[in-house]
């Protein structure tokens, strides 16, 4: 199970359990997924005792129960909208990309050149982008427009890379996009006085997993 292995967190698979019940009404699949998540999380914690995600201080906002419900409903709405847009855009690009009348190696060179340009602006944003996400989670930048630009840059490049048919998946890039989206939402909430600065990483963690499931 990918989520527990990535975060060494057995309860991370509970998101996929909920999805299995809600979408497919498959209790057996849900139970199997939950057990797989517990085993995968245990094995990952045993083999890799040091997890970089453990350095993220996820401090829960000091809210009432009603305030937390409103927060989660807001995050659910934002994640659902952006997740749907991400899925639609990816499908459209996968249809358009093969129609580009250039040899395959030329298309690959285009992506390589774009990756080089991105690395000149922000080196850690290339690849999966998890190093950039971790740095933002531990020391969040407060410039919203810059984070929006980095998220859109990473999002567009990830969509074209995934649509190109190159080996590799979109698991880590999707997590990074969700985390950066969560950072943007959290920064807006900080400016509105709804949460504190130290709660940003908490919102980012929630949005990372939620965006992955939404997509």
Label each PLM-derived region with a short phrase.
Residues 1-215:
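Alpha-helical transmembrane segments and immediately membrane-proximal extracytoplasmic
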